[in-house]
Amino acid sequence: MNSKHLKLLIALIALLVLANIGIQFWQPHPATAPQTAKKPRVQTTLPAPKQYAQTPFDWHSVVLESNLWKISKAGQPDSYLLGTIHIGKANAQISPALAQLISQSQKIITEVPADIPESTQQSLVQAMLSDTPLLQKMGSRAFNALKQHIRSYPNAEPLLQSLDQLHPWAVLLNTLSLREADESNETGVDNLITAQAIAQHKPRGSLESHIEVLAYFHVLPEELIIAGLNDWVQHPKKDNDKIIFEAYAHGDFARIPSLLQKDTEFNPESSLSPAQQQQFADWFVQQMIVARNRNWLPKIQAEAAKQPTLFAVGTAHLLGNQGLIMLLRHNGYQVDPMPKLAVWQ
């Protein structure tokens, strides 16, 4: 598993607004712009994420027949679980079918809030800033190569302006906002759902806070992240990196578990050692998927008991023996595939 594959995998867990943090938080802004004067910086300490014992993960426990699943339980209204992807084609628009699904739901729940209060923005920014320059941590050759690679993306300038001030984990997070010219964060499924929910004046909620998600990035060892960034630079994105997105866009959902499993396996072309690749794979599966699924389950149960709700989460959260489909079934819910939902027109 190399770090260009990691970006694809994280696209399937749909970090929503977090994927745009680098773009929206690093614009010149009096409150967030780097200060030239030497003033004491307010330190933000991220909370330790909730940890669980490592669990064997079987990608194929669920046949992903659809991206849309109905959640049913006696005495409760039906709700829906939609697997998403936060990357879309530039200028793509929401489909009438997805707009209708939002209309028939009384509440829309996404992974994180779409609205980020100013105080939270400041906390996120301060958490990302490092007192030690990234150049010093990486060395000039690797740092300059990273800058050059980031510069190849058309929306890279805000990240480049602050790159040297960020913790390595924050750089990894911010690279998730980088897009090819024909791709867009704004037309990712989650962002389209949020925009439509706002237009329809639907009550909205979330399964976790931005700070809670950042904490899972923060647990990665710094030297591992730097090695991953170097690997990402040395192995540029290729056409086959679009395979997962194309599978989702064309409704080939049953293929996604195998694609994800393959990308968590050893990759001989990577500059990362087998142990480093395994660390990244374990982090992605056990922290970014399994732990967060377990954190979310009580919230999903509580909301589903109140009203017909649309839960929109990254597709990878539906998969496997520790995915939301199986966790809900183990807790007395009937979870059935619905006809595939085309999310874009």
Predicted regions and their residues:
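Generic N-terminal leader/processing signal
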Residues: 2-5, 18, 36-37
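Structured, acidic catalytic/metal-binding patches in enzyme active sites
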Residues: 40-59, 65-280, 284
